[in-house]
Amino acid sequence: MTEPIFMVGARGCGKTTVGRELARALGYEFVDTDIFMQHTSGMTVADVVAAEGWPGFRRRESEALQAVATPNRVVATGGGMVLLEQNRQFMRAHGTVVYLFAPAEELALRLQASPQAHQRPTLTGRPIAEEMEAVLREREALYQDVAHYVVDATQPPAAIVCELMQTMRLPAA
């Protein structure tokens, strides 16, 4: 397999952490669409949202997805990447999609402990636990629909990588 592997899921599910470890295990390159967008725009996610609103952010997110989708690469996508049908179609057509599932309570705990919390603008203006429940209600079907593989993201990252390597029959680097 040389096609890109796209990691999808809500904020805090481990897309970046697991994606980096999976890329290392495969000898692939790793890229995070949010970080790619920050480098190309010179703005943080919060700055893009403040300057261009969520529609502008989603447009930039789609552009980043297409720019980074190259062979031998693991791509951590933004939590809302699945909101646009064109992104879901693109990922399914151009790679393998892995959904890292974690319950809302777990996601909220991780986000509260995250040092990057200030860079992640609130989607709803509600407390993080309520927000994550609302986000999963809105997006769960989209994550499930786009995914080739669904993985329990409450496991340690190394266990998730091991599971993916076995399930996807991926050769180690």
UniProtKB/Swiss-Prot annotation:
Question: InterPro entries, from UniProt?
Answer: P-loop_NTPase, Shikimate/glucono_kinase, Shikimate_kinase/TSH1, Shikimate_kinase_2, Shikimate_kinase_CS
What's one GO BP annotation on this UniProt entry?
A: chorismate biosynthetic process
Binding positions for ATP per the UniProt entry: 12-17, 120, 155
Q: Which cofactors go with this protein?
A: Mg(2+)
At the top of the EC hierarchy, this enzyme's class is transferase
Q: Give the recorded effect for residue 15 to M.
A: Loss of activity. Increased thermostability
What this protein catalyses is: shikimate + ATP = 3-phosphoshikimate + ADP + H(+)
Q: What is its EC number?
A: 2.7.1.71
Q: Does the keyword Disulfide bond apply?
A: no
- Protein residues bound to substrate: 34, 58, 79, 139
Metabolic or biological pathway: Metabolic intermediate biosynthesis; chorismate biosynthesis; chorismate from D-erythrose 4-phosphate and phosphoenolpyruvate: step 5/7
**Single GO MF annotation:** ATP binding
Q: What is known of its domains?
A: The LID domain closes over the active site upon ATP binding.
* NCBIfam families linked: PRK03731.1
Protein name per its UniProtKB record: Shikimate kinase 2
Q: Which organism is it from?
A: Dickeya chrysanthemi (Pectobacterium chrysanthemi)
